[in-house]
């Protein structure tokens, strides 16, 4: 992936809880792709725009590291 693009596990921001992937629209806003959701150590790669984000999940995302830092305030 090089130095520019990163695959990273991130915590879901509190303001996104109970919203759908389509509602947060990070692909359009930040050019970041959600690869999977992780809960209880298990990855769920079967996600759609209608998938709702839950409190105890994290995301596996792919994008430019600068975009990931900006989006998730890393």
Question: Where are the regions a protein language model picked out?
Answer:
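Short, small-residue-biased leader/transition segments that mark boundaries at the very start
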Residues: 4-5
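Short, surface-exposed ligand-recognition loops at beta-strand->loop->(often short) alpha-helix junctions
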Residues: 10-16
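Cytosolic Rossmann-like ligand/nucleotide-binding regulatory domains
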Residues: 16-74
């Amino acid at each position: 992936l090089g130095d520019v693009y990163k695959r990273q596990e991130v915590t879901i921001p509190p303001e996104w809880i109970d919203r759908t992937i389509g509602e947060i629209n990070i692909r359009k806003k930040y050019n970041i792709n959600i690869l999977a959701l992780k809960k209880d150590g298990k990855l769920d790669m079967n996600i759609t725009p209608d998938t709702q984000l839950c409190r105890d999940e994290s995301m596996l995302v792919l994008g430019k590291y600068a975009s990931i830092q900006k989006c998730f305030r890393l």
